[in-house]
């Protein structure tokens, strides 16, 4: 039996982790914590477990084997440092902090202590990526283009995460929240440690907040050119909650995703097929949760950890600087 705790449970992503973990066999949720004690108490009552306002008090009291750590982005480094020092394995919600140096320091500390520290860069575990790599891993990628425009930021006010609209707490807007997945993919597929920011544009014109509500970025990873376009602009609260389009080109294939569940694959000879596959992050959190706990028990490394998050955050720092947001 794995004893699991959740901290920062007012985070709007909590259901993406909590619901899959609740369904896993041989897992017991022993406690939750949040700076808002009412939220912690409400979640704990539903789970029948302990609650605390201070995650350090909770960890000392329930002594979990594994922690899913969420919370405000600015608070994440302190959470991770505590868990590393306490010798508690954990998965830390991205972006793990609000700057590259912060997350790089966490990666250094975790590696020095031999800590199990996973980060849910879940598109690395996606069927979308598996299908592309199965066909094109040996070809190399010429162009990678990812567009995902999400809903307006007022949703964070109604979901109990108003801090997401404040740059000092969130570190940024759509780029650090949504774009980080695609920046990580470009770095991963481009297979280069040297990522160059060729151009970056950010804007807060739509909502006049301290965070960007739109960004357009061009990167170079080796010989691969990658673009990321993201924002908080799409006016929908329904199932079709995003405006998205991916395009990926290799010498032998061209891939297009126009929605969250299909991938169009064309060969260089003009043969095209469409396959059913999840293309966005949301559908892959159950897989991440089961896999990260399995890897923890088996003493295997996570698919992505703080070092990978630090690389993405370092690129984001360069992007924000080029785009005039820092």
Where are these regions (language model features)?
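C-terminal helix-rich "cap/oligomerization" subdomain common to oxidoreductases
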Residues: 1, 59, 66-68, 115, ...
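N-terminal Rossmann-like dinucleotide-binding module
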Residues: 1-46
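Short, Asp-centered acidic motifs that coordinate Mg2+ and/or phosphate
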Residues: 31, 66, 143
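Beta-loop-alpha module in the N-terminal Rossmann-like domain of NAD(P)-dependent dehydrogenases
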Residues: 36, 47-107
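Hydrophobic residues in well-ordered beta-strands that form the structural core
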Residues: 53, 92-93, 117-119, 257
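A contiguous active-site-proximal alpha/beta segment in oxidoreductase catalytic domains
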Residues: 97-156
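Rossmann-like dinucleotide-binding domain that binds NAD(P)(H)
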Residues: 161-241, 307-311
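NAD(P)-dinucleotide binding in Rossmann-like oxidoreductases
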Residues: 207-212, 221-288
């Amino acid at each position: 039996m794995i004893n699991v705790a959740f901290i920062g449970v007012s985070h709007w992503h909590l259901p993406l982790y909590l619901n899959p973990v609740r369904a896993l066999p041989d897992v017991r949720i022993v406690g939750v914590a949040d700076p808002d004690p009412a939220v912690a108490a409400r979640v704990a009552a539903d789970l029948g477990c302990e609650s605390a306002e201070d995650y350090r008090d909770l960890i000392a009291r329930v002594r979990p084997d594994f922690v899913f750590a969420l919370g405000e982005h600015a608070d994440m480094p302190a959470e991770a440092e505590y868990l590393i020092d306490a010798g508690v394995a954990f998965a830390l919600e991205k972006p793990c902090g609000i700057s590259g140096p912060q997350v790089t320091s966490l990666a250094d500390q975790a590696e020095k202590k031999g800590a199990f520290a996973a980060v849910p860069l879940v598109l690395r575990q996606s069927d979308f990526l598996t299908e592309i790599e199965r066909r094109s891993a040996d070809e190399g990628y010429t162009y990678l283009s990812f567009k995902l425009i999400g809903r307006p930021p007022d949703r964070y006010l109604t979901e109990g995460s108003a801090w997401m609209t404040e740059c000092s707490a969130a570190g940024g807007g759509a780029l650090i929240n949504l774009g980080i997945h695609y920046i990580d993919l470009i770095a991963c597929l481009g297979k280069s440690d040297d990522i160059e920011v060729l151009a970056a544009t950010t804007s807060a014109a739509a909502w006049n907040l301290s965070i960007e509500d739109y960004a357009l970025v061009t990167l170079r990873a080796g010989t691969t050119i990658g673009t990321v376009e993201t924002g908080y602009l799409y006016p929908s609260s329904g199932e079709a909650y995003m405006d998205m389009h991916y395009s990926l080109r290799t010498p032998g294939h061209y891939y297009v995703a126009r929605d969250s569940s299909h991938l169009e694959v064309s060969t260089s000879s003009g043969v095209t097929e469409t396959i059913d596959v999840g293309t966005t992050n949301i559908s892959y959190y159950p897989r991440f949760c089961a896999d990260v706990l399995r890897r923890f028990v088996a003493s295997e490394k996570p698919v992505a950890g703080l070092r990978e998050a630090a690389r993405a955050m370092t690129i984001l720092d360069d992007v924000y600087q080029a785009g005039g947001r820092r």
